[in-house]
Each structure stands twice: as C-alpha cells, then as structure tokens.
C-alpha cells in the first residue's frame, strides 16, 4: 500500500512540474512522518514482554486445569509472536504447537455476523428491519407484531430467542437436522425483544440461514469463500479435514471427584453455525488483525470500515455493564456480536468461545491495534483466560512505542 502511495506521489510530481517544489516536498515529508508514526505505533519490545508474560501463561494453565494452550500476539497488521504450552493429548504426551487445532466455539459468531452484514452492504436488508418480513418458509413464532424481532436484535442477543444447543457425540449416529428443519421446528421467542440480554445460539443459527437465503450460496461455502479464504484461514473448517485431524487436540474436563483431567467427547449440534468450528491460533490471529485494521487483511477487505465501526459500538446503553457477569467493566456491552468496552481510556473488542472441553478467547485494543488470541483444550476456563489476555495487552502497551492511534468515545 505504501509503495502505491509513493508511486502516485511521484507521478503527480512529474505531471505537475509547475507546482512549487517546496509544496511537494512538504507533502512528501508529511507522508514520511505518517509512515514513521504508524510504524512506531506497531513496535512492541518482546524482550521485555515475554519474561513477564510467559510465567503468567504457565500459571494460567495450572490454575485453570488447562492441558494445553496456543497463543498469539498481534501488533498493527502482523502476528509478532506465537507459542504453545502443555500437551494437546495428555495420554500420548503430544506437545501443543501454534498449528494445533482446537474448537474455536463462539469466537466464530462474529465471523457469521460479518457474512450477514456483507449482505446488508449489498442492500439486501437494514439492521432495524423486521426479520419475519424476509422469512418465507417459516416464521419466528410467538412474536408480538407491535414488538418485532429485528436483525439488530439477533446480533445483540436481545431477540428473545432462547439459548438452545442440542449437542450430540461427534461419532454418534444422530445427525443434526438441516438449518431449515431445525428452525422450522424450534424458532420461537420466549419473551419480547429488548427485555434482557439472553445469549442465543438459536439466533445465530437463524443468522446462518439468512446468509444462505440472501446470498443464494450454501452457508458453509459462503463462509469459506468470503471469510476463511480472504483471511488465509487455511486451517479453519466446520469439520476437521484429515490434515487437521492429525493436529487436533483432545478436549478435557475436570473430574469433580478426583480433580484429574479426563478426555471427553467432541460434539456436533443442531446450532452448529453458532460455534462448532475448528481452527488454529494463527488463523484466529488473522481474523483479529482484520478487525483491528478496519476490516482489511493484507489489502483484502471483508467489510467496510463504517460497518465494522457499527459492529464495535455498544448498541444498547440499557444493557451496559458486564457481559453476562463474566467479562468487562461498567462500560462493557454488546456491539453487533463483538463485546465492547473502554478500559484505561482505550477501546476494546473481545469474544470468548467454549464447547465441551475447549475454551477460546480473543481480545483487541482498537486504539493501539494490539491483539491477543488464545485457544485451549481446557473446559470453561473463561475467567483465567480473561485475566491473562488483559495482562498480555497491558504488557504490550507498557513495553512498546505504541502511541494511541485514535480517541476513545
């Protein structure tokens, strides 16, 4: 991108020879200052960060009964460091690596939201439109026409649709129903929209159906073409490919009687678009980079900056505060799927994921473009990962030349 800017400037200087040389030199100097500032904002001194961060990672694994974790740090538009700890398979003593595959859970939800908002940018719907107006094969049941469920409600967990999950062992005979069949039988609100925040996997199964309906492309194919491929998420999939199976971690839960870690079954679910997705921390880092850089990854844009800013803005002030009591401070709340908050004057985005022996977390500082991604095969380890993520970002801020790139609002 910078090469393109310099080439353009040289062409303009050649084309307009009559213009003041001093003026053109002024423009060039300003551009160089801009480049220097951006580069400085993305520099993190890992020699200072890692001696403090790595012991914290080890303590987190111990405190959270987490067999293994793969971790990545992001600054600007790059992964600046990655490492892995513990064993992805305790019985085989298989060391985890940055290429170990885990289930990423609900961290996938924001990817599905991007897919839906891509359709919004094509003019297919507006955020505050009634969803039922776009459903032809079935409807959201129990809806009060005076208080209709909108697209914004779906993306903020305020629709009144229930949580739902419906898990089955991955090697069992039970096959999850198609999106159409599941939604036709299950899509019913339990309360009016905006009554409260109720984390809803069913809502995001409907989001997947809507992406498919608007685009005319099967949902899994659409996600592959419009999210995974442009972001070079080559080891992320709804079902692990053979090469991913070779790197797949075993999910573990803690035996309540003995305190020991036990392998548990991987699951499939009726609401699989809500987070039954597998990936690596390196792929998660690419996703986080796109969200910290205005919707672009290596000059490939997946969403406009204006739409992404909507995603990263808290939507309903009445629901500010902790996200279901587990993350954030008094400013925290849902954007369009992403969790958002302001801490120490900086704006943050975050999301976790947890399914049957796996816990994942993503945290990004929007104003300094710093990010932390972690995938684990520990069960319900959220509080430990949240503390570790905050520590990692704080250390990167402390040991960097990262000047604030924008002002929190």
Per-segment meaning from a language model:
Residues 62-95, 127, 169-176, 234, ...:
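A short, well-structured edge-of-sheet supersecondary motif
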Residues 82-85, 164-170, 224, 238-241, ...:
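Short, solvent-exposed loop/turn and secondary-structure capping segments
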Residues 112-113, 203-208, 285-286:
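Well-ordered alpha-helical segments within folded domains of soluble proteins
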Residues 63, 90-201, 217, 242-266:
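Active-site-proximal loop and beta-strand segments within enzyme catalytic domains
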Residues 42-83, 212-225, 229, 262-409:
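Catalytic loop of the DD-peptidase/beta-lactamase superfamily, centered on the K-T-G motif
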Residues 37-41:
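Sec/Tat signal peptide C-region and signal peptidase I cleavage site
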Residues 1-20:
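N-terminal secretory signal peptides that target proteins for export/translocation
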Residues 25-36:
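Bacterial N-terminal signal peptides
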